[in-house]
């Protein structure tokens, strides 16, 4: 399968945290994705970019926190994450580049 340039716009970056690393034991990988990306788009992008079979996609949107920037109140951007479940036997090493 070949990757389309728009797939690189859907998958922003992998999430590398302790919780995300623990999910790899359950054959799941966590990615930051574009805010308007849909589950079918995320599934297609991961399958084409990493050459794996995706069995499920769960998404969540983390609302941005209110913070002070140089004495003025501001708000961080919302972040959309996707938890991608891979087929048995497929793995993605997120520590390496695409």
UniProtKB/Swiss-Prot annotation:
GO terms for cellular component: ribonucleoprotein complex; ribosome. Transmembrane segments: none annotated. One of its GO terms (molecular function) is structural constituent of ribosome. Signal peptide: none annotated. Keywords: Ribonucleoprotein, Ribosomal protein, RNA-binding, rRNA-binding. PANTHER family: 60S RIBOSOMAL PROTEIN L23A (PTHR11620). This is Large ribosomal subunit protein uL23. It comes from Methylorubrum extorquens (strain PA1). The lineage of its organism: Bacteria, Pseudomonadati, Pseudomonadota, Alphaproteobacteria, Hyphomicrobiales.
